[in-house]
């Protein structure tokens, strides 16, 4: 599966970066307020008309002759832009997203690694 972040696709590198799993289709939580009112058996629910940001986790496989340089390039691609950027997937879904926390790299072989990326995102409607 292909994806792009900040208008650059995962297929535009000199190394191979393949998205193997993503939870981007998980629905965001509705934003509401629950207010306890004395004498009432249940809470008053106020719908704020919004959805909360969600966390998207993508797992990719990286294949490169030099994992260190490839990881630096991935970091620069995902973490250099300041603020929210467009994250889109080949199924047509699109989000305003920012990388949340570390980009986790787990080396599998000398030339292969598993990359885990977490984004804080809200859906573009």
Regions found by a protein language model. Give the residues of each.
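Extracellular/virion structural assembly segments
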Residues: 1-125
């Amino acid at each position: 599966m292909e994806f792009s972040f900040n208008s650059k696709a995962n297929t535009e590198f000199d190394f191979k970066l393949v998205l193997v799993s993503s939870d981007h289709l998980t629905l965001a939580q509705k934003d509401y307020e629950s207010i306890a009112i004395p004498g009432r058996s249940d809470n008053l629910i106020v719908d704020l008309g919004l959805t909360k940001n969600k966390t998207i986790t993508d797992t990719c496989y990286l294949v490169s002759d030099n994992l260190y340089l490839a990881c630096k390039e991935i970091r620069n691609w995902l973490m250099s832009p300041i603020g929210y950027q467009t994250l889109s997937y080949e199924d047509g879904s699109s989000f305003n997203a920012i990388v949340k926390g570390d980009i986790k790299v787990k080396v599998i072989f000398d030339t292969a690694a598993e990359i885990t990326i977490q984004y804080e995102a809200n859906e573009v409607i």
